[in-house]
A protein has these predicted regions:
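Catalytic cores of RNA-modifying enzymes
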Residues: 1-225, 255, 266, 275-286
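Active-site-proximal catalytic alpha-helix in oxidoreductases
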Residues: 229
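Short helix-coil junctions and helix-kink-helix linkers
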Residues: 240-245
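Short amphipathic alpha-helix in the helical subdomain of ABC transporter nucleotide-binding domains
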Residues: 247-250
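Short helix/strand-capping connector loops at secondary-structure junctions
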Residues: 252-261
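P-loop NTP-binding site
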Residues: 272
Length: 286
């Protein structure tokens, strides 16, 4: 029996049955258009046999589209009512036993997942999208690629290049793991309720070799945070607190890393930040 997808009327009926109202607190907007969830799966290049993790499956519209493509899904859902109902929804839409695993938990607290997923596909709750992405990339090194739907502003930040207006700490931290790209736009009309912001698809591929170990990552991210907290200041001032305490000491470290002390944080690539962290030997925060 082929997997069938949810329609708009069925999604609303499911929500009513569960007494679920999409909430701004959880950043919920349910996708009610089958073509959109198929588009996400297509852009993510989901193949039969792929092990996919989905964060925030909600009522299951994207979940079913991933399963329709022949992948297995581990779905992480914070709302107990939704997590409890999802297996029954999948079973009634032709999903084979064992293809779906539901983890009833806060995605930001999950550090282990069954099935060693290699692909992340999700309509991420907008208020936690960047923290969730960085958490999963940090804790699940087996994740090799992914496509997620996020608020347009967030997607532009994740895929931003140095020197652009949207380039910031999330851009650099995301780039630590590999390249990111904007992969498409999504109409507001495919959501229930209709959001007051635009949405985009953003994709990533993890680099074959990590940039460094966990200690270097923590050091690098600490420097990135300091640089963008005072993004208009020259790095010798912005980084003085984490590179010795004075602008002069920071300048010595920056020059050792091959970075101009008069540069600003928004001009640097992730590789520049890694070199600064390596040159500094900054102690990781306790």
């Amino acid at each position: 029996m082929p997997v069938t997808l949810l329609g708009a009327a069925e999604i609303r009926a499911l929500a009513a049955d569960l007494d679920v109202t999409p909430t701004k607190k959880l950043g919920q907007n349910f996708v009610v258009d089958a073509n959109t969830v198929r588009k996400i799966v297509h852009v993510a290049e989901v193949q039969p046999g792929d092990r996919v993790v989905e964060v925030g499956p909600g009522l299951g519209s994207l979940t079913l589209a991933i399963l329709e493509a022949g992948a297995s899904v581990t779905a992480v859902e914070i709302d107990h009512r939704l997590a409890e109902r999802l297996p029954a929804t999948a079973a009634s839409h032709g999903v084979a036993d064992g293809a779906l695993t539901v983890v009833d938990a806060d995605a930001l607290r999950v550090t282990e997942l069954p099935g060693d997923p290699a692909v992340l596909v999700a309509n991420l709750p907008y208020n936690v999208s960047v923290p969730v992405l960085l958490h999963f990339l940090e804790h699940f090194p087996g994740l090799q690629r992914g496509v997620v739907m996020v608020q347009a502003e967030v997607g532009e930040r994740l895929a931003a290049a140095p020197g652009s207006k949207t380039y910031g700490a999330p851009s650099v931290k995301a780039a630590w793991y590999g390249p990111w790209r904007l992969a498409g736009t999504v109409s507001r009309q495919v959501f229930w309720p209709v959001p007051n912001v635009d949405s985009v698809l953003v994709g990533f591929h993890r680099d074959a070799e990590p940039r460094g170990d966990e200690e270097l990552r923590v050091r690098t991210f600490r420097i990135v945070d300091a640089a963008f907290q005072q993004r208009r200041k020259m790095l010798r001032q912005a980084l003085s607190g984490v590179l010795g305490g004075t602008a002069a000491e920071a300048s010595v470290v920056l020059e050792r890393a091959g970075v101009a002390p008069t540069a600003r944080g928004e001009e640097l690539t992730v590789d520049d930040y890694v070199r600064i962290a390596q040159a500094a030997g900054v102690s990781a925060p306790a």
